[in-house]
């Protein structure tokens, strides 16, 4: 029984190993939509968000691992959702926060399973 559990954990680990390509493929729709920019620099990937009103970049994040890239894109996506769901500039309600967190958690799982985002 112990061997089976260890094998399953090993197998889950192998499946869930992320690569930069997996993350970029998973979030291609978010990147193409302009939620964030992802650039490959000589130091690695960078995720940048654009503030249209201020006309400047903000939240520039260096991502040295695929997991860091996934989290930076998810953070930008959460910010996008917050702006989309909360149109009257109030602080998010607990329900709105839960909705954003659930969508983000679902996308994290999708990315870990090498899936692809199909809806913003």
Where are these regions (language model features)?
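Negatively charged, low-complexity tracts enriched in Asp/Glu with abundant Ser/Thr
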Residues: 6-33, 117
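A short, sequence-level motif marking secondary-structure junctions
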Residues: 11, 52-53, 63-68
């Amino acid at each position: 029984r112990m061997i089976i559990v260890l094998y399953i954990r090993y197998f889950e680990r192998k499946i869930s190993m992320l690569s930069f390509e997996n993350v970029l493929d998973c979030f291609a729709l978010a990147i193409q939509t302009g939620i964030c920019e992802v650039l490959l620099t000589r130091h690695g990937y960078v995720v940048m968000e654009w503030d249209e009103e201020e006309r400047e970049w903000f939240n520039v994040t260096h991502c040295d691992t695929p997991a860091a890239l996934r989290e930076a894109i998810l953070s930008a996506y959460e910010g996008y959702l917050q702006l989309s769901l909360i149109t009257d500039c109030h602080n998010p309600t607990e329900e709105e926060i839960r909705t954003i967190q659930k969508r983000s958690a679902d996308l994290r799982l999708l990315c870990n399973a090498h899936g692809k985002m199909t809806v913003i």
